[in-house]
């Protein structure tokens, strides 16, 4: 039996979230989606993390940056892929050692980065 990897996509743009879901299912991930920051924070606060958390930096309610800070304090930031259309924000987080992609990203880049994160 194949060990399926899991991903939580926290993205307020529902069309983009659905596209990410399809792209991740194509490479064998089970996908959970959340569409606002507060729900994302609640889901990640008490649960065991999925293999990968794909986190939009600009969310309604609680920002992706705040959620990332919480995960970083818990030492769980290596499982996170930060996503933003803001190139400077992505570069800033990359310089700090975070996994970050500018969106929209090419499908193969997205799949490659997520697979690397899931592999540890």
Task: Name what the model sees in each region.
Residues 14-32:
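Two-component/phosphorelay signaling modules centered on CheY-like receiver
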Residues 13, 86:
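Two-component His->Asp phosphorelay active-site signatures
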Residues 103-104:
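A Lys-centered signature of the CheY-like receiver
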Residues 56:
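Active-site residues of response regulator receiver
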Residues 65-77:
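Short amphipathic alpha-helix used as the core "switch/output" element in two-component signaling
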Residues 60:
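The feature encodes the CheY-like receiver
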Residues 33-52:
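Acidic, metal-coordinating helix/loop segments flanking the phosphotransfer/catalytic sites
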